[in-house]
């Protein structure tokens, strides 16, 4: 990292119906937008661009739009993001790790990842998933009866009824925050790392965008052992996008589209992510790689076009690298 992420341009928290429109941002020493526990958030014609006169080679020193535990709809429309020092968009929740089981309805929960310290995971009345950290599949869904922040590392949770099979090491996730996402008409280019990081259980649509990403243009992940970023997806549609010479830095992506949750232990007939549809996109590729995916139930691909380029030396790899994928079809659910 270039230096400490000291000052985001916008910090939006516990808000509703926030619109950031017609904004030109040249630089900030942090993320452009941090949004947390918000309902209905719009970034429209919000550009992050290199200054036309100054000689600075990067724009913001971290992510563009970083949304944590939001709900309702996140709309990102007609935006232009370039030259950030991290991903343009990251949408996710937070897994809290069960540090200690106090009773069959009480747990001490730890925030493990350093940048999540001090974040309250929810409040009484909200629904939490109790999740097996090895499979990352839900064990149960429970209503939170009581919540207390003990310090920046630990918080106390009491559920409304006893929970069978509570174990230390399992994780919890607030299920009330799972936004629908629409990303449309945007350009994402020339930044460090990846493109869109999408982990939300809402309806996710990515349509008519242009990607020039050093790593994966689309990364669908989720993990319970490092970043602790949550969000098993149910339905993601990638439609009419242009993926131009993406994934030329292997450390940041195995293919232009990558699905790679951290769980490597599977249960029969069930996967962490559910459905990904890739249709009518244009892939401009300097090698064969299109999709690298694991731990997802179904991928549907049809109507896509592949255009060969010679922009970079080819990187060895399969067109479709799959592990633990239950079905690949050309027949959409919609």
State each model region's role.
Residues 1-3, 137-181, 189-190:
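Small/polar beta-strand repeat architecture
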Residues 4-15, 30-38, 65-68, 174-175, ...:
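Extracellular beta-strand-rich solenoid/capping regions of secreted or surface-exposed proteins
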Residues 5, 15, 26-30, 38, ...:
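Surface-exposed loop/turn segments connecting beta-strands in extracellular beta-rich domains
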Residues 7-9, 29-34, 51-63, 72, ...:
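Short glycine/acidic-rich loop motifs that flank beta-strands on beta-rich extracellular proteins
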Residues 15-19, 36-42, 72-75, 179-182, ...:
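Short "repeat-start/strand-capping" segments in structured domains, especially the N-termini
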Residues 97-129:
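Surface beta-strand/loop "capping" patches
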Residues 116-152:
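Ser/Thr/Gly-rich low-complexity blocks that favor extended beta-strand/coil architectures
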């Amino acid at each position: 990292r270039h230096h400490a992420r000291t000052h985001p341009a916008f910090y939006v928290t516990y808000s509703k119906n926030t619109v950031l429109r017609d904004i030109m941002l040249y630089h900030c020493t942090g993320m452009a937008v941090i949004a947390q526990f918000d309902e209905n958030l719009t970034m429209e014609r919000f550009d992050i661009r290199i200054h036309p006169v100054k000689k600075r080679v990067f724009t913001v020193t971290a992510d563009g739009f970083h949304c944590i535990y939001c709900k309702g709809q996140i709309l990102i429309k007609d935006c232009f993001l370039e030259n950030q020092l991290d991903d343009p968009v990251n949408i996710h929740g937070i897994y809290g790790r069960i540090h200690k089981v106090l009773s069959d309805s009480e747990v001490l929960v730890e925030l493990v990842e350093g940048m999540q310290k001090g974040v309250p995971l929810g409040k009484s009345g909200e629904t939490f998933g109790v999740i097996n950290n090895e499979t990352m599949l839900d064990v149960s869904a429970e209503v939170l009866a009581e919540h207390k922040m003990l310090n920046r590392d630990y918080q106390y949770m009491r559920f409304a009824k006893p929970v069978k099979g509570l174990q230390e090491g399992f994780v919890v996730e607030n299920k009330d925050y799972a936004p629908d996402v629409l990303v449309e008409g945007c350009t994402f280019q020339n930044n460090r790392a990846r493109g869109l990081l999408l982990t939300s259980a809402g309806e996710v649509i990515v349509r008519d965008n242009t990607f020039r990403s050093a790593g994966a243009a689309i990364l669908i992940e989720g993990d319970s052992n490092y970043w602790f970023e949550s969000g098993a997806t149910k339905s993601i549609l990638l439609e009419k996008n242009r993926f131009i010479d993406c994934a030329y830095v292997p450390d940041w992506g195995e293919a232009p589209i990558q699905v790679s949750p951290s769980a490597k232990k599977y249960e029969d007939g069930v996967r962490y992510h559910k459905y990904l549809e890739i249709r009518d996109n244009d892939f401009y590729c300097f090698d064969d790689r299109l999709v690298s995916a694991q731990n997802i139930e179904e991928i549907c691909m049809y109507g896509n076009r592949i255009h060969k380029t010679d922009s970079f030396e080819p990187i060895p790899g399969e067109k479709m690298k799959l592990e633990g994928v239950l079905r690949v079809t050309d027949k959409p659910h919609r």
